């Protein structure tokens, strides 16, 4: 049965609250709030009892899918289990009750946490300095590109091109375009890595930087990264790393050691903060020595035993947020790093790589692998075999997976893989869970061959059956009158 909207449950006069009396004298609302800010008609809020509100949202939560419920295999999203200790520290009154405009002497604990987190992130990635301010990965991308632009301006360079590999996240060219750059695509080779000949042919005096993800979006490590770094820097360009896949690198290797000048982190992914449903995120940016003068203000500095916000950065590109970043995510990431330590972080990446390769080995006979293995933390399969032989598309496979109790993986991305199924199991899934997930995909491959109509009509057991995705995207109806 369809769950009704909270407004459909409303009945006039029904209440779920009671207010105690007070001794304050009554007075017209206009005496307190200027009339231009007052409504001319009453708000059409739902009138429901407390029990109805609780039951409504509990029912909705039971319909929802989340990482606390089961494996969440979205490729390039790192939907790992988020330790509850992270939420505990985030909820401590000394953090949760803060206001960003409080005097510095009353926020020393928060400033210390941010200072130490930046230092830990700097060390993890091998960079010279880190800003915590950007609110998400794409926000960090834009910040990094603006830092690159400022650097070139500071040396009198008017470079206007930015190279982006063809397997990149769509936010890479979008961020570069927002910063005013012309986007040039660099091809991949037959092994799924950057084509050095194509890169060499596109490097000229107008190229400001190359944006690269390592491991790339197919889950492959760029084995020629040192050669790429030399080519880019010999051209007077800078090297940018999208840190979306840093869950494969912790304690094993560092972007700074590969020659990257800028890297953004996705704290909500790599360092375990809940981020389904659009946020919150955090996208700190690490830079090499020559970009430090341009970092965002304010910068947290330590003077003796005191932490302060410093605005004395005349070459800074300014702010990317009104305040200092998504602080709750920073607290969670700090807790995660401190709980695991250097050895634990390395085990995170080692186990993520092991899980991805183990799961891939279970699926190879039933699905196509467009590029060679081994992979790092994720892999990209193709549903071409099922589509060509049985008329079952990757979309159908993803929908059918819902009937088996799993969230679907990322599909149709990256664009260079036909009928793409991008899967990232993360380090927090057990062998038993991976086995069950693999068996679900193997069963779907068998169904595609023997009962394709079942797969193309899926899902059939979920509370809501197959949606018209195109209509849902183009004809939004999410508003209500208040």
UniProtKB/Swiss-Prot annotation:
CDD domains: GDC-P. One of its GO terms (cellular component) is glycine cleavage complex. Pfam families: Aminotran_5, GcvP2_C. Its EC number is 1.4.4.2. GO terms for molecular function: glycine binding; glycine dehydrogenase (decarboxylating) activity; pyridoxal phosphate binding. HAMAP family: GcvPB. The glycine cleavage system catalyzes the degradation of glycine. The P protein binds the alpha-amino group of glycine through its pyridoxal phosphate cofactor; CO(2) is released and the remaining methylamine moiety is then transferred to the lipoamide cofactor of the H protein. Belongs to the GcvP family. C-terminal subunit subfamily. This is Probable glycine dehydrogenase (decarboxylating) subunit 2. It comes from Pelodictyon phaeoclathratiforme (strain DSM 5477 / BU-1).
């Amino acid at each position: 049965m369809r769950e009704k909207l909270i407004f459909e449950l409303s009945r006039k006069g029904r209440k779920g609250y009671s207010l105690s009396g007070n001794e304050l004298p009554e007075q017209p609302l206009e005496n307190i709030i200027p009339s231009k800010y007052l409504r001319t008609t009453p708000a059409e809020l739902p009138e429901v009892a407390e029990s109805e509100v609780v039951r409504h949202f509990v029912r909705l939560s039971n319909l929802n899918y989340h990482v606390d419920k089961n494996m969440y295999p979205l490729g390039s999203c790192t939907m790992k289990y988020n330790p509850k200790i992270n939420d505990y520290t985030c909820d401590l009154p000394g953090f949760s009750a803060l206001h960003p405009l409080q005097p510095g002497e009353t926020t020393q604990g928060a400033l210390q946490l941010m200072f130490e987190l930046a230092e830990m992130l700097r060390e993890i990635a091998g960079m010279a300095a880190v800003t915590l301010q950007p609110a998400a990965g794409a926000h960090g991308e834009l910040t990094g590109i603006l830092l690159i632009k400022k650097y070139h301006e500071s040396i009198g360079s008017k470079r206007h091109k930015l190279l982006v590999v063809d397997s990149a996240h769509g936010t890479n060219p979008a961020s570069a375009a927002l910063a005013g750059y012309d986007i040039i695509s660099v091809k991949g080779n037959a092994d799924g890595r950057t084509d050095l000949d194509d890169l060499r042919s596109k490097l000229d005096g107008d190229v400001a930087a190359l944006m690269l993800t390592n491991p790339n979006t197919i889950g492959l490590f760029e084995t020629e990264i040192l050669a790429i770094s030399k080519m880019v820097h010999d051209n007077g360009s800078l090297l940018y790393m999208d840190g979306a896949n840093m869950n494969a690198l912790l304690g094993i290797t560092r972007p700074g050691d590969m020659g990257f000048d800028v890297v953004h982190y996705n704290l909500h992914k790599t360092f375990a903060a809940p981020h389904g449903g659009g946020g919150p995120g955090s996208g700190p940016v690490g830079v090499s020595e020559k970009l430090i003068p341009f970092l965002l203000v304010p910068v947290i500095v330590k003077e003796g035993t005191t932490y302060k916000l410093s605005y004395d950065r005349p070459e800074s590109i300014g702010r990317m947020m009104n305040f200092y970043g998504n602080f709750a995510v920073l607290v969670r990431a700090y807790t995660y790093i401190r709980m695991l330590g250097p050895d634990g972080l390395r085990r995170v990446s080692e186990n993520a790589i092991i899980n991805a390769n183990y799961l891939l080995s279970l699926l190879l006979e039933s699905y196509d692998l467009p590029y060679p293995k081994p992979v790092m933390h994720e892999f990209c399969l193709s549903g071409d075999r099922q589509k060509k032989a049985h008329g079952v598309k990757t979309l159908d496979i993803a929908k059918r997976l819902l009937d088996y109790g799993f969230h679907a993986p990322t599909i149709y991305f990256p664009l260079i893989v036909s009928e793409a199924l991008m899967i990232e199991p993360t380090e927090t899934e057990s062998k038993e869970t991976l086995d069950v997930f693999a068996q679900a995909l193997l069963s779907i491959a068998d169904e595609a061959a023997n009962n394709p109509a079942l797969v193309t009509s899926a899902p059939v057991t979920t509370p809501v059956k197959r949606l018209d995705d195109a209509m849902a995207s183009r004809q939004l109806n999410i508003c209500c009158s208040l």
